[in-house]
Amino acid sequence: AMYEDNPFWVLYERGIESYYGNHTLSHRVLGTKETVSNISQQDMKQYFDERYAADNTVLAVAGCLDFDEVVAQANSLCGHWPTSGTARSYQPVVPQSDDFTMHLPTLAQAYVALIAPFPGANDDDRYAAALLSHILGGADGSRLHWALIETGLSEDAAAYFDPRDRTGEFLAYAACQPDQLEQVESLLRSEIDGLITSLTESDLERARAVFATASTLSEELSSGRMRRLGRLWTYSGEYRSLEDELKRIS
């Protein structure tokens, strides 16, 4: 219910469902009232037993530790966990082209969103994709900020890159007055179309600095380092140092 009160989230979920079509990625993570209501206690237990098993779990640790001791403790505490034989299947993604309009009479503003294919979380092109998304609509000095927000046409405008396992999507959106929707969408598309040809080395240097700083600061916390290592291992099955990560960003 909380998400249903957020106009952007309503549009986003409907857009993702349309974009991925019959693919499992079109399913809402939190489900719908209908799907949640139809889940039984036995269904939840079966799902937990299948997914939260020893052969489907990654243990990531960071900080001042003794690796051999960590392994011994993990074996002691978790060695008895059963395996379930669960495996991830990778259904081919075929992006769907669709144009739809939702009418919500309680809203005073109009919202527009565009979704397109982008690299996945295990694709090295994700670094370039992240930089492009940031330059286009990831900060106050972004292209969308100057074209739509600073001009007073939009209250909110941004671009995101959402990397997933072996696929990803790009999202650009804006909120505005209904009578300005056509103009805002036109400018939104124009900024996307002209991004590559208008890029400068200064744009890239600033974006690289933002990501490098964020990565470095995150590594100063054990929790941040664990999340990065765990996510990287889950997606690619490899270890990568912060230094290597920074080289890929630059």
Question: Which residues does each predicted region cover?
Answer:
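Mature, solvent-exposed C-terminal subdomains and processed small-chain segments of exported/organellar
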Residues: 1-53, 64-250
